[in-house]
Amino acid sequence: MKIIFILLIFIFPNIASAKNFNLEKIVDLNGPWGSSFINNEELIITEKSGKIKIINIVSKQISEINHNLNFLEHGQGGILDILFNDNFIYVSYTENRGNGKTSTSIAKTKFSKKELKFENIFQANPPINSGYHFGSRLAIKDDYLFASAGERGEGMIAQDPTKHPGSIIRINLDGSIPKDNPRFKGKSNWLPEIYQIGIRNPQGLVLSPFDRKIYMSNHGARGGDWFGEVKEGENYGWKILGWGGTNYSGIPIGPKWKPGFTKAIHYWVPSIATSAITIYKGKEFSEWNGHALITSLKDQSLRKLIFKDLSNVKEDIVFQKKIGRLRDIQVHPENGKIYFLAGDSLWLMEKN
């Protein structure tokens, strides 16, 4: 068992004030991507290469569940996010659409530890021959499923509401279309599933247990990552806006923000490669209640944002370069301890 003890000492303004944390590796995995608690002792997780597993966080036993997903592991794609809700499983994945083309698709099934027989409830169209920018995070609010569909590296497709890539999707839990989506409220040229456009590669999506808003994180290009709110019928501006970043060639993309587009709550330039997020609520770190926790891949850090006052957002680095690239984050529903998918492992964070 690998245990790292961390003393975060208040040296710089952006480093979290002195705390003793314990980071413990629970189990080793192979390219884990998404996770969801199914009860107080078990997580269901995905591995991008195609496996769905149950991990008992007490006994540390791992079991694999057979499934029928027609997925393709291609570049950044594979089996991605997973969400347990009311004894159903929702999964976002890279669907093989033939001729080298794939889509961000969502499937649903009744939960079983023996076999998961998924049925599709959404496909992002058109399918695209690309291994980039699938997005793929899932969140449920009331009886609606929200999902992020990345722009697949196609840039300005995110400004085309007749195509799904580069948008936030909102559908009913059975895959049908809500009658109050933007399409039916003045956005007659929008596809009926689309809730918001102008997004690049959103790998964080969460419902706040406090204000009941949906929040997201998004990858910029060379700089320009951000954290913001999902807003009905609005446009975050990609690829008209660059959010402070540039193309990988160094050529500017566009302004950081301008009127007419949704403004993010917080930006990162240079990029930290934001991934999964949560709005913390729990006992273990009760002083963090209501704060956003942002995982990062490139920067290998956990960031904490205090954003109650949008004119004075405060950021702390909780830890950095301790457990590898942080892909996903879950808060235990009872005790508030924090679990990460990072590198090729599941990790636990708790107070000493």
Where are these regions (language model features)?
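Short linear, low-complexity motifs centered on an aromatic residue
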Residues: 1-2, 82
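Residue-level detector of conserved, well-ordered beta-strand and adjacent loop positions
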Residues: 24-27, 66-67, 122-123, 184, ...
